[in-house]
Amino acid sequence: GEEIAGAKQSEFDKLRGTKMGLVPQDPMSNLNPVWRIGTQVKEALKANNMDVAHEKRSALAKALAGDEVEVKGNDDETFLGAKELPELMTEAKKALTEAGVSGEAFDKAVARFTNEWVPGSETRWRVADDLIKAGVADDQAWYLAKKYVTGSTMDDRIAGLLSEAGLPDAATRARQFPHEFSGGMRQRALIAIGLACRPDLLIADEPTSALDVTVQKRILDHLHMLTDSLGTAVLFITHDLGLAAERAQHIVVMYKGQVVESGPSLEVLQHPQHPYTKRLVAAAPSLASQRIISAKERGEDADALLDHHIAGESTLEKSEHIITVDHLTKEFKLPRKKEMFKAVDDVSFSVKRGTTLAIVGESGSGKSTVANMVLHLLKPTSGKVFYEGRDTSTFKSKDLLGFRRHVQPVFQNPYGSLDPMYSIFRSIEEPLRIHKIGDKKWRANRVKELLDMVEMPASVMGRYPNELSGGQRQRIAIARAMALDPDVIVCDEAVSALDVLVQDQVLRLLNDLQAEKGLSYLFITHDLAVVRQIADEVVVMQHGKLVEHATTDEVFDHPQKQYTRDLLDAIPGGKLQLGLD
C-alpha cells in the first residue's frame, strides 16, 4: 500500500532487487557479453547486500553484539567485496579500532572473521583458466579447480540459483559466457538474477517472446513453480494474448498509455468490450485456429485459396516446384571437438510455385541452416538445392547474381539487416543499383512504388532505420526484398519479434503480395500459430531431421509424430475458446 510514484532515487534503490525483481525481454542485450554468467548473478546479490562479503559483516556484527559493543558508522561500508584476506583483515581491524573495540572483544571478533573467511569464487575461476592455458581440457581443469581450491559459499549460492532456474550442471554453466548459452538458457539465467534476492514482486517483461513454443512453455512452467513456491507475485507484460489467457488471473489492456479494459483473464478475452481489445483478440495468432475454421465455414476451401494465390499465373501448373531441396546435409566443426556436428541431416522437400511452405521446429532444429543453404549463403556438406530445376551448386558468378535477383530474404531483425547509416531510400534502392536496373529517376520512382506496395508513405525515404518502429522497419525490409520482383522470398522468423497487431498487418501484407505477384514463400518460424495463418504446407524439423511433412490442415488436425503433437500442445492459448466473433 506504499505510494512509490514520487519516491526518490535512493528509495527506489532499496526496492529494487529485494522488493521488486525484473526479467527483461532480450537476454543478449541485458547480459554483459564479457562477464561470466556466475559473475552477473553475483553482481545482483552484491548490489543488494546478499553476497558473501555482507555475510562476513553480519558475522562480525553478531560477534560484537554478543559483547554488547556498538558498531559506529555505516556497516555496509565496513568491508569491500572481492578482496583477499590480508586486505580485508586490515580493513576489519581499522573498522573495529574506529568503533572503539579493544581487548578481548577485538581478538574475538578478528578470530571469528578469520575462521569464516574463504577465498571467493573468482579464485577457482582463475586457477581453472590458468590450467586451461597450460593445455588442460576445460572439463578437467574445472574439476581440478573445484577439488583442490577452497570454494566459497557464494559458489554454492550461484550454482543453486542457476539450478533453481532450470539450468543443468549449474556449477559449470556459471563459468560460461552468454554467447555459449542458447536463447532459452540465457533467459533462465535472467530468471535466476531476477529471483536471486527473493523479491516480493517479479516484473516479467516479454520474457519469452523470442523463444520457440516448447522452450517457452518449459520456462514459464518453471517460472510459475518458482514464484508459487517463493510466494512471489508476477507482473507479466506481453503482447501474446494466448500467454496472458493461460498464465494470468487478471488482465489489464493498455492503449496509447491508458488502461482501456481490465478484469479476470478469461472474462476479458472471451467477452472483450473495448474496440482495441477486440482487435487484439481478432489478430492474436495464438488463437488463429478459430479464424481458419470460420474462413472454411464461409466456403473458402484450400483449393480456392491456392487458386487465388496463383492468380495471373495460368500458364503454370500448381504442382510445379520452384525450389527443390534434395537430401540436404550440413555439418560443422566444433571447437575442441573431434566429431562433426550435423546441423541438417538428409532433408528433402519442394516448394510449389505460388504457395507457402513453412519450416517449423525448436531452436537448434536446423531451420535457419536450411534457409541459408537455399539462399546460397551456406554450402551444403552433401545434397543439392534446385531452383526451377537447376542445381544451384553449379551456378557461376553470373548465374548466382541472377539467382539472387529471383530469390530474396526477409530476416528476423530488420534493424540488423538494414544498414543504420543508409537512408530508407538508399536501402531500398541498393539492390536496383547493384543489378544495374534503370536510371536514377526510374529507381526513385520504383522506390516510391515499393513503399506504396508495403503501405508506407513516400515521406519516409529520407529517414533512417532508427527513426522507424519495428513493424515499419520490417515493411521496409519487405519492400527491399520486393525491389527486384523475385519469384521466391525466404522469410526467416520475419514476424517473431513483432506485437500481435503489427504481426497481423505484416502477415496480411505478405498474403496480399503473394496473391498479386504469384510469389512463393519459404517461411521459417518457431510459431505454429502463425503457420496456420499463412502456410499451405508444413515441414517439421527436429535435431536437423525432417520428421513430418504434410498440408497445414493435416499437420494441425491429424499430426502423425509425437514431436509435432508436443509442438501443437505448447501453443499458448491454443485450446482456449475466446471471443473472436
Name every feature range the model reports, one short phrase each:
Residues A196-D200, A483-D487, Q503:
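A short, proline-enriched helix->beta-strand linker immediately N-terminal to the Walker B motif
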Residues G1-E3, S58, A137, G383-D391:
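Conserved ABC transporter NBD signature motif
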Residues L375:
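Helix-to-loop junction immediately C-terminal to a conserved catalytic motif
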